[in-house]
Swiss-Prot record:
Descriptive protein name: Centromere-binding protein 1
SMART domains from the UniProt entry: HLH
Superkingdom of this protein's organism: Eukaryota
Gene Ontology molecular function: DNA binding; DNA-binding transcription factor activity; protein dimerization activity
Gene this protein is translated from: CBF1
Length: 359
């Protein structure tokens, strides 16, 4: 069994070596001029389709198998299995030629070129498929960013807040009603003294204040009123329109306004009396004196303006006359100096001494 097994292994190795040499010879043999450069080089086979090359290799292998009569008939079954195994190995070698060290550099270049073309086609197909997937893809984030959805959530939150406010108001109203019932029972149990105190308290309410007994209860209950609305802290509740307290309040406010107005008038009249030359006591006298004084000041101002205008005109006339007289005197003086110089020259020419120089 061991000798038979080694013989089969040797036969397989021989067949594989022959097939490798045949494949290399097929790649290196002369071929047609596919590039049109009048040169039947080995690189022309690189332009051949890889499928055609594989087909030729299979035909060559089939021819080799038919012409091989040296094998024994007894080992036909094992040879058939070896042929099938060798064909599978040959297909693997045709796909990955660059892995076998017996393949030349030219074969590697041819195989790499075909692999690059196939890889380029596959990449282009994958890119096209990815682009189609991106076109068909719908972004979920864009759907989530819909403004309508956000608005709906805000509306739900606002509705919940409003419902909570309504529940709070109902609770406040319930506490106010319970407090009113407790106050009524306390007032009924109290005697005549409490009734008088209640009457006093009602009078205080008309004036805009609260009784001492109920004020503490209102503070404990959070200031809840009869209608469930709590008044603002630090403020008295408003009085009813048309009541005596309301009328009294309006009367007091009117008096305060009148008092301030009269005070302002008196202050202005006092300042006006200080400006008058004659002091007066009554307001009417002060106002009349002030009117007369102002009228007199206006008349005096008008007279002074006329007087000052006339004086200005007269002064301008006098200035102009003096200016002209001064100009004439200057001209005469210059002429006199010229005549004097001429006389001096004539005296010198006549041999007479100048009497002005001796003096």
């Amino acid at each position: 069994m061991s000798g038979k097994r080694s013989y089969q292994d040797d036969q397989l190795d021989v067949e594989e070596a022959n097939k490798r040499h045949q494949m290399v010879d097929t790649l290196l043999r002369g071929s047609e001029d596919k590039d049109g450069d009048n040169d039947n080089s080995v690189y022309d086979d690189l332009l051949q389709d890889p499928e055609e090359v594989e087909k030729e290799n299979k035909e060559n292998r089939d021819g080799d198998k038919v012409g091989d009569d040296e094998h024994d008939v007894v080992k036909g079954e094992s040879e058939g299995q070896a042929a099938e195994q060798s064909s599978a190995d040959q297909n693997d070698e045709n796909i990955n030629v660059d892995v076998d060290p017996s393949v030349t550099a030219v074969a590697r270049a041819a195989q790499h070129a075909s692999q690059r073309r196939e890889a380029g086609d596959e990449d282009e197909d994958e890119d096209e498929e990815e682009e189609e997937d991106e076109d068909d893809h719908v972004d979920i984030d864009d759907v989530d960013k819909d403004p309508d959805a956000v608005i709906d959530e805000d509306d739900d939150e606002e509705d919940e807040d409003q419902a909570q406010r309504r529940r709070g108001k109902k609770n406040i109203e319930g506490t106010g009603e319970s407090n009113d019932s407790e106050r009524a029972t306390k007032i009924g149990e109290s005697g005549s003294s409490n009734e008088t105190a209640g009457a006093d308290g009602s009078g205080d309410r008309e004036d805009g204040s609260q009784p001492d007994g109920t004020e503490h209860d209102d503070e404990e209950n959070g200031g809840a009123g009869a209608g469930g609305a709590a008044p603002r802290r630090g403020r008295k509740p408003g009085t009813e329109t048309g009541s005596t307290a309301w009328k009294q309040q309006r009367k007091e406010s009117h008096k305060e306004v009148e008092r301030r107005r009269r005070q302002n008038i008196n202050t202005a009249i006092e300042k006006l009396s200080d400006l008058l030359p004659v002091k007066e006591t009554s307001k009417a006298a002060i106002l009349s004196r002030a009117a007369e004084y102002i009228q007199k000041m206006k008349e005096t101002e008008t007279a002074n303006i006329e007087k000052w205008t006339l004086q200005k005109l007269l002064g301008e006339q006098q200035v102009s006359s003096l200016t002209s007289a001064n100009d004439k005197l200057e001209q005469e003086l210059s002429k006199a100096y010229k005549n004097l110089e001429e006389l001096k020259k004539k005296l010198k020419e006549a041999g007479i001494e100048d009497p002005t120089e001796e003096e």
